[in-house]
């Protein structure tokens, strides 16, 4: 399949905010919404790319096989993707590349996080584990802090304004 032939057929989401449902249920709800809006059946899905970083906070990691099983397609290959802030983008890229290469015609890409119940200290600490903890994390660097430092360096290097970044 040509890259130009790859498209997004549907999308799904849950409500935003503090949800009582488990991370597995939240992921399933969003996945079902995407499948329904695409106008396909779960059995038409040939692979799943499920992104999640903080599943451990809800006592559930390796969401790929869990989601596919809950959709009734446990035989469908899936990949659980954990790539910090880029998890959703990495999932989308992998799905796009595999469809464009002709490996699959229909795939599911879902990204889910649930950290409203963890507290800021836990979440910030866990996020620091996504970087090189012994080099950056122990120094107190966090992704928001690192992103801010890079933005500030860009502004200084190129004599840009905050509006230029917006």
Residues covered by each model-derived region:
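Aromatic/His-enriched, Gly/Pro-containing loop or helix-boundary segments
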Residues: 73-94
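Short, flexible coil/turn micro-motifs enriched in small/turn-prone residues
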Residues: 5-7, 12, 83, 97, ...
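Hydrophobic or amphipathic alpha-helical targeting/insertion segments
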Residues: 96-110, 119-122
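Conserved "HGTGT" condensation-loop signature of ketosynthase/thiolase-family condensing enzymes
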Residues: 1-77, 112-166
């Amino acid at each position: 399949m040509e890259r130009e032939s790859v498209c997004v057929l549907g999308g799904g989401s849950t409500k935003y905010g503090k949800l009582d449902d488990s991370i597995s249920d939240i992921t399933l709800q969003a996945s079902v919404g995407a499948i329904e809006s695409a106008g396909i059946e779960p059995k038409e899905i040939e692979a799943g790319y499920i992104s999640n970083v903080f599943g451990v906070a809800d006592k559930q990691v390796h969401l790929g096989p869990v989601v596919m099983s809950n959709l009734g397609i446990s035989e469908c290959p899936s990949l659980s993707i954990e790539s910090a802030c880029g998890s959703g983008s990495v999932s989308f890229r992998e799905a796009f590349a595999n469809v464009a290469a002709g490996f699959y015609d229909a795939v599911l890409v879902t990204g889910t996080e649930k950290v409203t119940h963890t507290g800021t200290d836990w979440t910030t600490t866990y996020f620091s584990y996504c970087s090189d903890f012994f080099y950056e994390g122990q120094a107190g660097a966090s992704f928001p802090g690192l992103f801010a430092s890079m933005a500030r360096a860009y502004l200084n290097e190129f004599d840009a304004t905050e509006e230029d970044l917006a």
